[in-house]
């Protein structure tokens, strides 16, 4: 047995000492691995799971997402729960490709100085988010997150929100002409439950929350937009109805 092992090792030395054979071997292994991993994708119509409930962002949520990107939140927070036991037990169901199919660019992140935010929606109250964004250490004394108090005093500039929807449609987000046309009205309606056009807004964006998010009625701030975006994350797919096996291929 020992002699056989030595014989295999001796034969392998021939490859190690011959650079051409070594390169050929490396390329062969890469080719096999590529066929195993990439090949099946050519037979799939889509790599996105079939789920119920996903919809494009509302104008307010899209404005909040733009602020999220602008302030670099993705540098410290991920939006990607991996299928590992510790992550699933802490954050919830692992992330689905369908949940980020309308993100351009996606917000999966690459670093977790802070917790993952993929399912932060409805986990805390609006007041909690406002307080945390204004002064993180008032909630978590050990936090290294900077404060964003200016969001509460900065009026949201939504004059070009229709153009943002139109730009997203060009990269594949299925916004309709009606949604683009009423973008400004829909943004105003989402933060004001007394707005006459709330019913029309909810028809265009099912399950969208309608309320004043920053606790400052009568004024639409950047805080409204960011909190509205955060409160939506991870809430669109009902995992009580989601069937993992239906997406097996």
Annotate each PLM feature.
Residues 2, 6-13, 86-93, 99-102:
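Long, low-complexity, intrinsically disordered N-terminal extensions of eukaryotic proteins, enriched
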Residues 40-54, 59-63, 78, 94-107:
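Sequence context of c-type cytochrome heme-c attachment sites
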Residues 45-69, 81-84, 88, 113, ...:
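Electrostatic cytochrome c docking/interface patches
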Residues 64, 70-80, 129, 226-230:
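The canonical Cys-X-X-Cys-His
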Residues 76, 142-148, 237-246:
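Surface-exposed patches in mature extracellular/periplasmic domains of secreted proteins
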């Amino acid at each position: 047995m020992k002699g056989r092992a030595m014989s295999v090792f001796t034969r392998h030395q021939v490859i190690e000492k011959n650079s051409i054979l070594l390169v050929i071997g490396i390329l062969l292994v890469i080719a096999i691995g590529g066929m195993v991993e990439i090949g099946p994708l050519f037979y799939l119509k889509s790599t996105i799971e079939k789920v119920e409930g996903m919809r494009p962002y509302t104008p307010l949520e899209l404005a909040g997402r733009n602020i999220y990107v602008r302030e670099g939140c993705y540098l410290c927070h991920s939006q990607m729960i991996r299928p590992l036991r510790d992550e699933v037990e802490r954050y919830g169901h692992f992330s689905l490709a369908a949940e980020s199919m309308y993100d351009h660019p996606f917000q999966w992140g690459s670093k977790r100085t802070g917790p993952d935010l993929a399912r932060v929606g409805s986990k805390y109250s609006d007041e909690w988010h406002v307080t945390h964004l204004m002064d993180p250490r008032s909630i978590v004394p050990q936090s290294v997150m900077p404060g964003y108090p200016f969001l509460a005093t900065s009026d949201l500039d939504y004059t070009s929100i229709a153009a943002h929807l139109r730009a997203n449609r060009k990269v594949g987000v299925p916004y309709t002409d009606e949604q683009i046309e009423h973008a400004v009205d829909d943004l105003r309606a989402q933060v004001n439950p007394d707005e006459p056009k709330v019913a029309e807004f909810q028809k265009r964006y099912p399950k969208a929350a309608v309320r004043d998010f920053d606790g400052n009625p009568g004024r639409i701030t950047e805080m409204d937009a960011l909190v509205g975006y955060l409160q939506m994350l991870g809430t669109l797919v009902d995992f009580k109805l989601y069937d993992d096996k239906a997406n097996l291929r």
